[in-house]
Structure formats: structure tokens, C-alpha cells
A protein has these predicted regions:
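Outer-membrane beta-barrel architecture
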Residues: 9, 52-54, 95-97, 145-147, ...
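Residues that define the transmembrane beta-barrel architecture of outer-membrane proteins
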Residues: 20-22, 43-49, 88-92, 138-142, ...
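Repeated loop/turn-to-beta-strand initiation elements of outer-membrane beta-barrel proteins
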Residues: 22, 62-65, 106-108, 152-158, ...
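Outer-membrane beta-barrel "beta-signal"
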Residues: 31, 147-154, 162, 176-194
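Outer-membrane beta-barrel translocator domains and adjoining extracellular loop/strand segments
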Residues: 36-42, 77-84, 120-128, 168-173
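Residue-level signature of outer-membrane beta-barrel architecture
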Residues: 55-57, 100, 116, 148-150, ...
């Protein structure tokens, strides 16, 4: 995990130093998250949030790298008798996305994401329990997405994060994150490149 994070950060720093241009920005959006359970019933979806910053690094006219630093609410919901329980996981995520940019502001993106668990709570009937010890402290996923940015720097994006690693630290059953997100972002731009 540390090696992967080092490679992602070092690559981003190198690209920033050699890039055609770098635009920083902020973003926020909604997550629809669930947990995939190996050989069991998957968790139902739950709504949460994501928010943070980005650096859009133009490498060529049509290719960019975009590292981000995001606070992200994840987890899932489940039935307990007639009640609904929630697993609320809070991560600090660092995606590093390769983007192909069409000339009209549209983008396709994909890349790895490393996440660090900041907190984990289980909530049923207004009773909240800390369950952070039941989950691993880090997560690796792969992101797929698309977006659009205007000449003014305001944009929208959608993304799906497919968890690749087992986050369950309490038993031998594999549990993986699944997150669909949609949001808005603003890039501080020079109005010449998208």
C-alpha cells in the first residue's frame, strides 16, 4: 500500500513539473455506496457525500492526469428485522486518474484510488457503535468515469469506484467497497485549455 501511494504521488509530482499546464480545483458530490460481500448477501445502497480538491495536469492536448484528495462517506445499509441498519465508513481517498479529453469539454477517466479509513460506525435504531476495529485501515479501488468542464472551469462528473481489496478485518469473509458518485467541480483555469 505504501509503495503504491509513493508511486502515485511521485508520478503526479513529476507530471506537474513537466506538464503543459496545471489547474487546481475543488469538488463535491453525492455518493451512492454499498458493500459487496463474498458468498453472501450484499449490503443495500446508502447515500452519502464526497468533497475535496484536485489538480488537473495537462500532459498533452488530449491527455491529462488528475490526482484528487477527497473525504468520502461510504458503506451500506442492511435489514435488522423490521429496521434498517447502516454501516457508515469515512475515507480519505486519493484517486489518480488518467483522462482523455475531447475537444468540446467532455472527458473520460480511469485510474487507481488508495483510501485510508478515518472512521467506521454501525447505526441501528438511533444506537451508534464504533466498529473501526472491524475494518482494515486502507483500501484500493479502481475508478471509471466521465465528465464535462465548461470554458469557465465549472464542471460535472460521474464515477464508479470498484473496490479491489478486502476491507473486512473481523472475519474471513471478503467485503469490498462499491461506490457510484456524481458531483460538481470548479477548476481555476486560464480559459485557454480544458
Amino acid at each position: 500500500m505504501k509503495k503504491l501511494l509513493f508511486v502515485l504521488v511521485a508520478s503526479s509530482a513529476f507530471l506537474m513539473a513537466t506538464a503543459q499546464s496545471v489547474h487546481f480545483g475543488v469538488k463535491a458530490g453525492v455518493n451512492i455506496a454499498s458493500l459487496k460481500v463474498e458468498n453472501g448477501d450484499d449490503f443495500d445502497t446508502k447515500a452519502s457525500f464526497n468533497a475535496g480538491g484536485l489538480a488537473h495536469i495537462h500532459v498533452t492536448q488530449h491527455f491529462a492526469i488528475q490526482p484528487e484528495l477527497l473525504f468520502s462517506g461510504q458503506g451500506g445499509s442492511y435489514k435488522v428485522g423490521n429496521n434498517t441498519g447502516h454501516i457508515n465508513l469515512t475515507y480519505l481517498n486519493i484517486p489518480v486518474l488518467a483522462q482523455y479529453m475531447f475537444g468540446d469539454g467532455f472527458r473520460l477517466e480511469t485510474g487507481p484510488q488508495v483510501g485510508f479509513l478515518l472512521g467506521a460506525k454501525s447505526k441501528v435504531n438511533k444506537v451508534t457503535v464504533d466498529v473501526k476495529d472491524s475494518y482494515k485501515t486502507s483500501d484500493v479501488s479502481w475508478a471509471f468515469g466521465a465528465g464535462y468542464v465548461s470554458d469557465m472551469g465549472l464542471g460535472v462528473d460521474i464515477r464508479y469506484n470498484l473496490g479491489l481489496t478486502n476491507i473486512n478485518d473481523a472475519s474471513n469473509t471478503d467485503v469490498q467497497n462499491r461506490v457510484f458518485s456524481a458531483g460538481l467541480f470548479y477548476q481555476f483555469m486560464d480559459h485557454h485549455k480544458k
